[in-house]
Amino acid sequence: MELDQVGWRRSRKLCTDNLDQGSKTLETCKNIGGYFKPQGPGTEHINELITGDSIVSAEAVWDHVTMANRELAFKAGDVIKVLDASNKDWWWGQIDDEEGWFPASFVRLWVNQEDGVEEGPSDVQNGHLDPNSDCLCLGRPLQNRDQMRANVINEIMSTERHYIKHLKDICEGYLKQCRKRRDMFSDEQLKVIFGNIEDIYRFQMGFVRDLEKQYNNDDPHLSEIGPCFLEHQDGFWIYSEYCNNHLDACMELSKLMKDSRYQHFFEACRLLQQMIDIAIDGFLLTPVQKICKYPLQLAELLKYTAQDHSDYRYVAAALAVMRNVTQQINERKRRLENIDKIAQWQASVLDWEGEDILDRSSELIYTGEMAWIYQPYGRNQQRVFFLFDHQMVLCKKDLIRRDILYYKGRIDMDKYEVVDIEDGRDDDFNVSMKNAFKLHNKETEEIHLFFAKKLEEKIRWLRAFREERKMVQEDEKIGFEISENQKRQAAMTVRKVSKQKGVNSARSVPPSYPPPQDPLNQGQYLVPDGIAQSQVFEFTEPKRSQSPFWQNFSRLTPFKK
């Protein structure tokens, strides 16, 4: 097998024996054949389709990062319209309005290539399998919808088998060898670099085992694989931990690779395992890419599944499940990327007491200024409130410098329930109420009373509290938490920023506090009721606008006594 054909579709001869035991080796899989190569007649077929006004689409297998003006940059999973494939190594393609050259080895042609369809990520074009060569061919139209579905099924099965091989190579080729070198790697380092890759490998073997049971080898279009995704839907959440840890893994690898010993060691591991010629960070990226490709594959499968097919409703449900999984994983990854900002905000608050925000929280959900009365005192006080997951922090503005905040306490949201109150007089506090709500401690019976300036602001706060509880429940479901390494990294970032500004980190400059914002209109963290999560988040390219609260950090002026 040639090792330089990364990303091209393999032929349809597949090894399945003993796959569930994870014992397949490179030697026993050599019958699989090579990836589909766009060379010779294959390239001519592609150009014939292009010149014949057919649309030829390819999916990016790897990220292509370039600064060259005439090259096309893209990310794994992007769909590229191929405009010219005359050169076997470099093709000319288009994404949206951008055109440019890109390496042919970084993409693979989609399973089906139909003539005369409109371009779009959800469009699948026509192709067929040559029964004599077991290779994917292009150029001959397929009228049989069942054959199209069979092509997609075969593609899913093929990629799953190849993915298992990648995971096996990582676990046995790299991780196993690293554990033998205690002089080079500590347990903590291996945990950071490889995360829970072994858990993913075990889960994926069980998933593929069930897929094989549902696969109809004689009539692939009759296969019912939708139930497999539904049965294993909870298992896919283990990818969240891996994706959240991936940035730390890259940083740790980058530090190690500065030492030539580690470069030679990882290269020796690759050669010993007879792995394809890509660096270890490329292999470790595979699970991240894999989880975000499931919705693409299932959407393609659903398109060619008739509504009267026994698998239709299961595939539709599986597509919804996998979209939700990838969206939630993306959301949690975004939250981890924001923890540096939370740490910087805490460092800017004067007179801070107690545990750090990051010990329990990872997301600023909503912020605003309200009047507040605490039961024992019954005194109306104006405070600025910051609602995080698990807790709400109370701050007071400086009398002269209104952009300076002082820490005044916090409320444990895990112990309180929110009570909406109608306008009128409250007997407990003996005050008239308008736009008010309470936080009631279920254990101690303590009560906090809050007054919003307007009814709309009260509604936003009530919605924010519901969002906070929902977020906590979802985090508990998938075991989301900030690792100690990530907390240390955030603390280091704060010290670095403080040092660059020449300000002591213990009294770093606070941000200018913005007026309360509408989270539904200003790009904050609440999602309006009735708007699908898919309209807000995408796995590979989150489009959430940055909260105006954080943007003030870039406009700070040094604080002087």
UniProtKB/Swiss-Prot annotation:
Interacts with GPHN. Residues 499-524 are annotated as: Disordered. Keywords: Cytoplasm, Guanine-nucleotide releasing factor, Phosphoprotein, SH3 domain, Synapse. GO terms for molecular function: guanyl-nucleotide exchange factor activity. Pfam families: RhoGEF, SH3_2, SOS1_NGEF_PH. Residues 363-470 form the PH domain. This is Rho guanine nucleotide exchange factor 9. One of its GO terms (biological process) is regulation of postsynaptic specialization assembly. InterPro entries: ARHGEF9_SH3, DBL_dom_sf, DH_dom, PH-like_dom_sf, PH_domain, SH3-like_dom_sf, SH3_domain, SOS1_NGEF_PH. It comes from the Eukaryota. Acts as a guanine nucleotide exchange factor (GEF) for CDC42. Promotes formation of GPHN clusters. It is found in: Cytoplasm; Postsynaptic density. One of its GO terms (cellular component) is cytosol. Residues 53-112 form the SH3 domain. Residues 148-332 form the DH domain. Residues 145-155 are annotated as: Interaction with GPHN. Gene3D superfamilies: Dbl homology (DH) domain, Pleckstrin-homology domain (PH domain)/Phosphotyrosine-binding domain (PTB), SH3 Domains. The modification Phosphoserine is found at residue 547. Its main location: cytoplasm.
